[in-house]
Amino acid sequence: MRHRKSGRQLNRNSSHRQAMFRNMAGSLVRHEIIKTTLPKAKELRRVVEPLITLAKTDSVANRRLAFARTRDNEIVAKLFNELGPRFASRAGGYTRILKCGFRAGDNAPMAYIELVDRAESQAEVATAE
C-alpha cells in the first residue's frame, strides 16, 4: 500500500526523477519562467521553493547545501545573490503556476511556472500588445 507517500512518480525511476527536477529547477532559476506539463510544474514547486528559502540566509553551509541539490555554481550564485535578497520579505509562495492549455501531440495539460516577482522584459510586453 502507498499510504502517506507524497510526491508523484511521473513514470520514472527515482534517479531519473531526481535528475529531471534538478535540471528543471536550474532552468527555472536561470530563466525565471518555464513551460512544462502541469503535474511536473506542481512537483517542481516542491523542489524550488525550499531552495529559495535556503538562499534567504547566505552562509557557506547553505551555499554548499544548494550546490548539493543543484550541482551548478551559476545557479547557486543567482539564488544567493539575486533571488534570496529579492524574496527576503516574502514568507513562501515564490512560484506561480499558470495553466496554458493542452499539448498538441498527446493532449497533456501544460502550464507555465514562474517566479512571482519576475521582472517583465520588454520583449514579453511587446508580444502581449
UniProtKB/Swiss-Prot annotation:
Pfam families from the UniProt entry = Ribosomal_L17
Q: Which UniProt keywords apply?
A: Ribonucleoprotein, Ribosomal protein
InterPro entries per the record?
Answer: Ribosomal_bL17, Ribosomal_bL17_CS, Ribosomal_bL17_sf
Gene Ontology CC terms: cytosolic large ribosomal subunit
* Gene Ontology process terms (BP): translation
Instruction: Please list the GO terms describing molecular function.
Output: structural constituent of ribosome
Family label: Belongs to the bacterial ribosomal protein bL17 family.
Subunit text: Part of the 50S ribosomal subunit. Contacts protein L32.
Q: What is this protein called?
A: Large ribosomal subunit protein bL17
Q: Which organism is it from?
A: Serratia proteamaculans (strain 568)
